[in-house]
Amino acid sequence: MTAFFSILFNPLVWLTIVAILAFLTWQNYKKIDKLTVMNTDSVLLALEIPKTNDKSELAAEQLLASLHGILRDPTELKNNNGVQEHLSFEIVSVNGAIRFYVWMPRTLQSFVEGQIYSQYPTVQIYEAKEDYAENLENKHVVYLTEIDLIENEALPIKTFDGFEVDPLAGITGTLAKLDGTNDQIWIQVLARPVADDWHKKSDEWVKKVKSGKKAFKIDWKYILRILEALWTPPEGSENAKKEPSDRDKTRISKAEEKATKLGYQVKIRLAYLGEDEDTARLQIQALTGTFKQFNSTNLNGFKASNSSLDKDKIRDFQSRIFFDDGFILNIQELASIWHLPHTNVETPNIVWASSKTAEPPSKLPIITGDRAHDENISAFGLTNFRGINHQFGMLRRDRSRH
């Protein structure tokens, strides 16, 4: 009986039970969230930009700032079962062609399209006829990996203003090497807007660095050293404060700068689909290598994680599921990774817009909608601008003049 009570009141036993229950709860949450996402009506938009596009990465940053408007306030979240919508910005090489996509819940389609057009007026947007991620025919090898941050998310990665050459060129250059093969590479950058509360975590990190405390990931060895230090008498004055090094001063400055912009929770997924496992590993290694161009010795950077050959995990790509918190990037960092190509990107095989489009002339008699009717206009043609059909023709009163 004594042994039973000793086990019953052992804190390690209860800690283990709590940990197991927490894990099971988390797994259940994942399943519920996954079902919610998979049951959401979504749309995949293909974006084509003219090769003469002169909009820089700054346009993408402004786009992300406006798209941040999908952020729900606490009341809206409560009414929406706590679900905050996210977007997926994608670059894909299929059949040797490099395409740019944006995925979203269908309820956001009109808003997202409008924001894209506002920053890229010459872009052509089409609803994809089929989702590339659903076509796995004859793909025997599927190699998947994720991109994660090396350091604390308070520290920024290298951004586009620090590059002499557009960083997108390095990414698309790797995809272009698939030319002439049936292999595929998918890049999905999932982004969910977050409230400015994340700045508080950044401020806490800055305070720890300024005070000389450890501000990064803590492991068990570090905890043991802390416990050991508690039993060790102090050698100096309790009020002695260590001055931050020049390196820490730079990191503090950059972290504070990062926190001045809007933020997104981000998850980056990479997939290679082909026939040969060795080739798959080499291609993913090359692709993850291009993300290291955003690495900085004193600041933050990217590394590969969660690599897998498990085909079942491709479902996460197909559903664009985003169930955890990912890591935080601000709009400048996110725009450095994903933006529409411009004149400085000379990568072959990018699918550019074949022709420019413009809205109908202001004096042209038009009827908006392909089935609409206007008794004052004799319609004889149909045009499409930004996904909206317009009938055009001649005013009936002018017919007698011709």
Please report, for each region that a protein language model flagged, where it lies by residue.
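Extended, folded cores of ATP/NTP-driven motor/assembly subunits in large transport
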Residues: T2-A372, S378, G393, S400-R401
